[in-house]
Amino acid sequence: TTLFRSPDNERQLFDFYITAEEEDFSETLLNKTISEDSNYDEMIKPKLQNWELDRVSLIDKILRKMALTEFIHIPTVPTKVSINEYLDISKLYSTPRSREFINGILDKLMNEMKSSGKIIKTGRGLIE
């Protein structure tokens, strides 16, 4: 399968192939991040000390929401792996201070969600 596919248009946007598992992961990540957008805003707002949500950079918001999607909806990826991946992405696409900001909020949310049972990881070695 191609990276992006439309039922109406079978043209490839990228000339490389991904496995069905990678395609499922990508679709889940995209669809859940979009559909849970307002829920994620409500989860993030209380963790922003001395900041208004509308003042946070768009890329930082997106990266945090994608990480939350992995925490909640992708049971095969450990939370620490998700955090590290999004911190690495922030180094490339955001400001130098964003890394600490993203890490602090994700760490607080991860611990809170683990305690409340919202994060459930499955698979060998994934139960943290």
Annotate the PLM regions.
Residues E23-N31, D60-L68, L106:
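Amphipathic alpha-helical elements of HEAT/ARM-like alpha-solenoid repeat scaffolds that form extended
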Residues D8, I18-E27, K45:
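Elongated, mostly alpha-helical coiled-coil "stalk/stator" tethers of large membrane protein machines
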Residues E36-D37:
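Fold-level signal for large, globular catalytic cores of enzyme and receptor domains
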Residues N9-L13, M43-W51:
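Long, contiguous alpha-helical segments
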Residues D15-A20, L63:
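C-terminal subdomains that position terminal phosphate/3'-OH groups for nucleotidyl transfer/ligation
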Residues T2-L3:
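Short, small-residue-biased leader/transition segments that mark boundaries at the very start
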Residues P7-D8, I72-P78:
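Short helix-capping/linker segments at secondary-structure and domain boundaries
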Residues L53-K65, P75-E128:
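C-terminal non-catalytic interaction appendages of large macromolecular assemblies
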